[in-house]
Amino acid sequence: MASSSPLVDLVQLIARSLVDQPDQVVVREVPGDRFPRIELTVAREDIGKVIGKDGRTAQSIRTVLNAAASKAGRRAHLDILD
């Protein structure tokens, strides 16, 4: 089993704590042109829990992700896939 990046682990931990079906959470890192994209996929019925009212939960996850990436001298972008 390949080890995942700390950013992937962080998003996975946050997402699994928010959803009703944590076993359906899939997080992967995709190389980008300037910085990596972190792709988050959850069960269809949990997508609203991850996005939140007016996108506030998603924005909060992105803020934590960017803070962690910045501390490591990196940048990252979170995509929530449906």
Residue map of PLM features:
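RNA-contacting regions in translation and RNA-metabolism proteins
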Residues: 1-49, 60-82
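Glycine-centered tight-turn and secondary-structure capping sites
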Residues: 51-55
